[in-house]
Structure formats: C-alpha cells, structure tokens
Amino acid sequence: MSKSNFLKLCLARGFAVASLLLLPSAAREAVAETPFWQAAPAPSKVQGPQPQKRAQTPATKGAPKTESWRWRPESAPDGWSEFPFSPVAAPVEAVSAEKPPVALIGDHVAPSMTGRWQWKITRAAWTGQDEDRFAEFIRLIGESNCKTTHDCLTSPIANPLYHGNHPPGMPFFADCADLPFYLRAYFSWQNGLPFSFSTAVSLHPGTTAAKGSPSSFQVIGRYHIVPPGPDPRVAFPEVARVSTAHFRLPAVYRGRMLPDHYPVAITRESIKAGTIIFDPLGHIAVVYKVDDHGRVHFIDAHPDNSLTRGVYDSEIERGGPDSGAGFKRWRPQTLIGAKRAADGTLSGGRLKLMSDNQLPDWSDEQYHGTDAGRSADWRSARFLIGADAVDYHAFVRLRLAPAGYKFDPIEETRQRIRNICRELEQRVAAVDVAVQAGINKRPQPPRLPSNIYVTQGDWETYATPSRDAQLKSMFRALREDVARFAAIGPSQSKFIRYDGADLRADLLGTYGAEADACRVSYKKSDGSPVHLGFADIKRRLFSMSFDPYHCPERRWGASDPAELATCNDDKTKVSWYEAQQRLRNQLVRTIGDRMDFTLEDLRRQARENSDVGEDVAPNIDVASVLVK
C-alpha cells in the first residue's frame, strides 16, 4: 500500500474508535466483527456501564493507590438525546476518582462540592498574562527531568508554584490524548479559572465513514466546570473521556458545538509553550519551547503514565484540513452571567467559547500553504520563505527561527543523532516497564489486537509498535537529510550555511563521532546488562520486537545465540516473533487497518506477499551516501 493511499485509508476510518465510543459494549463487539466500510449493526441495550481499571505499572506505582479509571461510555439514552445532568452540592471528606456513569452527550455541568479542595472560580476568563504563565508552567515541566505526569505535577522542580497545593494522596494520570486537557485543567484549577472540554464526538456534517473517503468529527458533548466548582478529584477523571478523535476536527468547522482547539499560523506568537501538535497517525504532543534554531520541542505522554520529550520534525506527518492535523491552540473561554460574592468567588454563569471569526491567529496556512494562488488540494500546497518554495518541515523551522536563519548541515546531523539517542533511552524505559510487569512471562495471545497501534489494555500499555515506527522513521530521516545536504551543498541553496572545505568528510566525521557517543543498555532475562552502541542498534533495528510478550533479548533484536541463551521464550513465541518480521519492516503506522491476525494469518500473508507489512526493511545506512 502506498503511503498516500494509506493516509487516505486511515483518514477514511477517521479513528472509527470515536464512533465506537458512542455505542454500547455489545454493539461494539458486533462492530468489531464488521469491516469498517460496511454499516454497523444497531446498538443493543446493556445493563449499565462496566468499568475498566487502569493497570498498575511501575510508572504508576509511585502515585498514591487511589483508584484511577480509564473509562469509555458503555450506554446512552435511546436516540442519543441529551442526557440531563444537574449539579448537586455536597460536602466532600475524601473523594476517590471513579468512572463517570453515562456517556456525556450534550452540555453538562460538573457537580458542585463544598470543602477545602473545592475548585473555586474567581476569574471569568484567561488573560494574556495567564497564557504567559501557562506557557512557563509547561516549559518548566518540559525542561525538567520528570518521567511521569504524577512526578511532574508533584515535583518542586518541574512544578514549583503548585506542587504543594493538592489534596493528600491525589493521583495524576494522563496518556497521549489526555495530556493537553489534563495540564490545561490543572492550571485552570490552580488559578481559579473555569474550564470546559469536549466529552463526545460524532461524524462531522458532510462526512461519511465509507471506505476511501476522509472522516473527521464534530463535538456533541461538553463538560463545563463553572462556579460553584467541583472537587478536582471528581472533575479530573472526566478527562479520560478524551481520545485522539477529539483532535480530528476539520479546520473549517460546521458542528453546533465548538471544538476545544483551532489551527494557527506558523509564527512565534502562535507556536509556543502550550501549543498542541496533532500527528494524524494518532499521537498528541504539547510544545514546551521553540529554540533559536526554530526547533519545536515537545512533551508527550503514554499509556503507562510515562512522559517523554521529542523534537518536531519530518517523522510527524503533515495532514490535510479535514484531518485536524498540525499545530493547534486552545480556544478562549469566557464565563458570562456569573455573580461575584463578597469573598471574591464567582457563582453561576455559563461558558462561551470564542468562534473562529473572533480569533486573530486562526489560520489554515499549514494546510493550504502561503502561496498567493493557494491550491485547493492540500497535497499541492506551496510554502514560501520570501519568494523561495521549501518543504513544509523546513518552512516551520525557518518561520520560527530568527530572520535570515540558515541550516548548518553539521549541526543538523549532530542534533538528529542526539534526538535518536534520546528516543533509544526512552525505549529502554518503556521495555523495562513491560518486563517489570512480567508481561514477557505470560503466554502469547492467540491473536494480535484489532490494531497494534490503536488499542486498549495491556497491549496499549506495554507494546511499542508506534514508538518503534517513530524510531525507524528517525533513522530514515537522518539518512535522507544527510543525503540531501551532500547532494545540494551550500552553494546551491540560500538556506544552507557551511564554512568548511569538504562537506562530505565533515558529515561523515560528525556522524561517526556522535554515533560513537550514543550508547544504551538493557537487562537480559537474567538481569545481566547488555551494552549497545548506535551501530549495534542500527544493525538490529528491524529485528527489535514491539511485542511485550517476548523476552527482553528479542525486544532488543538479539540474534547471537550467546545473547539469546537467557531468553525463555517458548516455540510459540519464537514463531510469533519470526512471523511479525513484515510488520517490523514497515515504518507507516497503519492505524486504519484491521490487524487482529493469528499466527497462521501472518504466515499466509508472507507467502502471498500481501500488503500487510513490508518484505524488505528500508535502507537507513548513512555512511553509504557519503562514501563514494
């Protein structure tokens, strides 16, 4: 399958998961057996929602042992009419985070609760100063060394202003899609601000779920935190209703309920700490700084509650306007009609979101380009720096860097390798989480999940297919960048600066020095360490298993019998490892494809040379493009 066709396909499915979230569980099971391009069976009634507890992992064990729920709606009123929800005042002694009871379609208000930790609202809207302080709050988290959402918010280094202002034992947990909402809600709570966020989505008007047509969504439910406010321990678990589908909203939006975010122009004023990045292949990140080289640094969260850091580059896909991909900012919210009490707190009122035509930095230029003759087809968009057209990711860098900035091939190569090395270190931690949880000691399941990149349960928490695809893409991008620098040279591009005498030799020397400095270690099944250099990783990259049921030796691509001697995988696991090779060879995260294969399915696909996976891994060797 070509990359462009794949993108059409995954946009066509449009995270059909979002639609499934609005169905009872019995209907979801029926839909799971139906190809996504066919009509789904009608939902059947079920007896109440069933909770799914978060798995305790080493990353979450540091948090207090209060129940945390990863909730998804199980039932809703007939006809999907608005479900009434009235605020109820009640004293709170000790509140634990429990699952919400029903699908929140329509407008809903958080229940008011009295007590020391009530979310008291003293101001009606964010100011420019609030936005600056929020940006600083995000920057400090990003530049700290905190490893989980809980650690970040309870650390005096990562969160110096608010770390001590929590109810005793309050846990903090956010994964991929939750993170932007969680951090925005947290800052609003700490600063006496109201907050509203989407709780349910459906297909956007004019969008169908037919195979081959792009899908995008509209908001059909919102949760409003207005005065008198709730206890935050009740309000925060509501954020678990959010999925990546809540970001897959079109730039030109026609839904009745306004979305949480809006697309912005690529400028320093709009791309800053707190801005959100939506990768259309299914991941969310939050910008924490833009450096003097125009590099966008971000934080992102994962199902095991870990928090990692990265740099925006070509590995993050550019998407079309209907996908909602790219850079977004929070839509301003204003509390209107509230009354102020003698103690300064507000009561009553309702939240109003600012419409697109009121937003000074709303822009769709990241989809349609900056050329005066904008193309209707986003794939043909041209991005200009002055009068010169550049590719999109270079455009982002040059727009955000100081005027006149030029790329230094040596420094770009150095930073690419360092970013890869940081990603490898983060993978070490991710694999360790699965090993510490004992997943590799469990029997191999008879099938893969319905999609290995977008799923729930232990696979979501412990498997690394998306992380590994990102890592492989980074290796490929390194090779492509070096090849481009070597081919073009500074004399042929006004955006490249190089002061040396032999660019190829200097690139090769930089590559060698940085590669030698990059080393990671993992623990084998018996606890003994294995030290791997950059060259070792490059050689075994497409042998590294993403499957958490495999031993750590195979998770790190071991092939030497001596290294594998401590691996306890049985014949079934070895067979699965071998059969997954085609999936390991691919870089594209096929989030729109059904992938609940058996072992025999994978073997048959290899025999028939199907379009699932790739027969051959891509070339990621850098030295070969520099040595003639």
List where the protein language model places each region:
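Bacterial N-terminal signal peptides that target proteins for export
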Residues: 2-15
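Bacterial N-terminal signal peptides
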Residues: 13-24
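Boundary at the C-terminal end of the N-terminal hydrophobic targeting segment
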Residues: 27-32
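N-terminal propeptides/low-complexity segments immediately following signal peptides
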Residues: 34-57, 61-73
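Mixed-charge, low-complexity intrinsically disordered regions
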Residues: 37, 69-242, 251-255, 342-628
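A recognition module on extended beta-rich or small alphabeta surfaces enriched in W/G with H and D/E
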Residues: 227-259, 303-351
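Short, well-ordered loop/turn sites that connect or cap secondary structure elements
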Residues: 265-273, 277
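Catalytic Cys-His active-site segments of thiol-dependent hydrolases/isopeptidases
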Residues: 280, 288-310
